[in-house]
């Protein structure tokens, strides 16, 4: 047995592979090891010196001592030097070899196959058939690459690539599709000239059929446009037969490739089955229509704005419909400032003798003719009216308000007597005894022909 046999592997008849650089060469005739020895001398002189017992060439640095004469290699012929240069791979070849090793390692790792599969004669024959110049890595190199894949999170990703874009970035949003759906996706890609039929046949052979979510809506619309149909799904049955001929043919060609891969019997889908597959695919991947928000309208939205409501009136039809639908409720009691009060009932409307200036004229206002006067313990008077519907009280219109006033000079502790007001007149009586600091006059708050609006007022004394 040759001394250098430990540096080589016999991969097939008439060929050997160097364990150091993975170089593959032809063996010598009749079991001669001359090609292996020649390769070791030229490319691995140190390893060859270990088994041969000779000293490898050494390089010394210039020192103060006289220079020593280095051993000179024997002169080689020109043809041998040229052959030696051809044996050394270039940088581009090394990059290609590393990429091949990486792909083989990924294939073995994802399929759960052992690393020594690279020594299998059938596996080597397949790779040699695809590329006669391929440099097949050894099992040790594959194991090293597998370890690096396990440490690298990007290389260790088992995310299957998309059959449309080939995206295999970890964590990209994708969906797993069936064989029929994948064939329809690829059919749409072929019909829109984004893939050739050969590329579609190759993509259907993926182990896991996944599609990125961002392709779903795009190819759904593309299939609509290709078939010449509108956005409604109901008219797919009304399309002519010639609209499905091209897609039907491409669909069967792509699906046959998948059936061949899975060792299934080759079955072609007829036109009715293709239409059923297509309709189900378009329905399952149809985008959902977003629900628009519907704002609820309230009573306050139906009424006018309250910014300048003094000269506005409530619509007649609106309140007529509102009053017919709602029952009469009890009036809301006016919230008193003090809990202790004395009730005093007066059948006359409550007005102040100094609530208007001398030049003001009485105007018709919708105040009720009869009001209940409440006299508090501290001398304040509160007037309130009978019931109004809660919808009117909460409709955004002013129902209860307060009039602030002040007088010049001292005021008596007892309130002034209120003069009587005729029943047919519902306005303020002007009086020149006391000036008015502020007066609020609200006209036409309600239509008197519709309802006798009854409002409550609160005044400070």
From Swiss-Prot:
InterPro entries: Znf_BED. Transmembrane segments: none annotated. A zinc finger (BED-type) spans 1-51. The keyword Zinc-finger applies. GO terms for molecular function: DNA binding; zinc ion binding. Keywords: Metal-binding, Zinc, Zinc-finger. Zn(2+) binds at residues 18, 21, 39, 44. Residues 404-423 are annotated as: Disordered. PROSITE patterns: ZF_BED. This is Uncharacterized protein ZK673.4. It comes from Caenorhabditis elegans.
